[in-house]
């Protein structure tokens, strides 16, 4: 899941200055979905993330009765779509999905910490981590009710 660089043949033909400029341009032109490694990488991250949440005593109570395979599938869809991938999120709105759960701001923050732990484990670069949080962060207003 590390940032991929252009082909070796192209890299060898470029000067260090041009290579630096070209790589920066290529990185900004690729979607976050591509830079995260695509669908299979997102599935792996979601699997680990859900395991982190299940082990997190601060928030695992919110997921105790969850249909875990369905939860994982919806998270993959959500991240895939939100990062520019080909998926379409088919789940309920965040407001509807979290209605009556009494999620507090610190609960949401714990979830974000668990995601960060997973992203660090998979060596996702900080830039992509920040972009992913920027995609998911606005959902907080629909999830946090207390």
Regions found by a protein language model. Give the residues of each.
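Bacterial N-terminal signal peptides that target proteins for export
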Residues: 1-11
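Alpha-helical transmembrane segments and their juxtamembrane interfaces
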Residues: 12-14, 66
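C-terminal segment of classical bacterial N-terminal signal peptides
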Residues: 15-24
């Amino acid at each position: 899941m590390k940032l991929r660089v252009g082909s070796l043949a192209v890299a060898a033909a470029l000067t260090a200055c041009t290579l630096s400029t070209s790589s920066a341009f290529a990185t900004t032109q690729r979607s976050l979905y591509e830079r995260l490694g695509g669908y299979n990488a997102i599935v792996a991250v979601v699997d680990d993330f859900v395991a982190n949440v299940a082990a997190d005593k601060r928030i695992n109570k919110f997921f105790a009765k969850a249909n875990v395979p369905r939860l994982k599938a919806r998270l993959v869809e959500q991240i895939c779509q939100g990062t520019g991938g080909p998926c379409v999120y088919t789940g309920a709105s965040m407001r509807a999905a979290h209605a009556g759960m009494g999620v507090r701001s610190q609960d949401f923050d714990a979830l974000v910490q668990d995601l960060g732990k997973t992203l660090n484990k998979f060596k996702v670069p900080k830039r992509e981590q920040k972009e992913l949080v920027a995609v998911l962060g606005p959902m907080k207003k629909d999830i946090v009710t207390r």
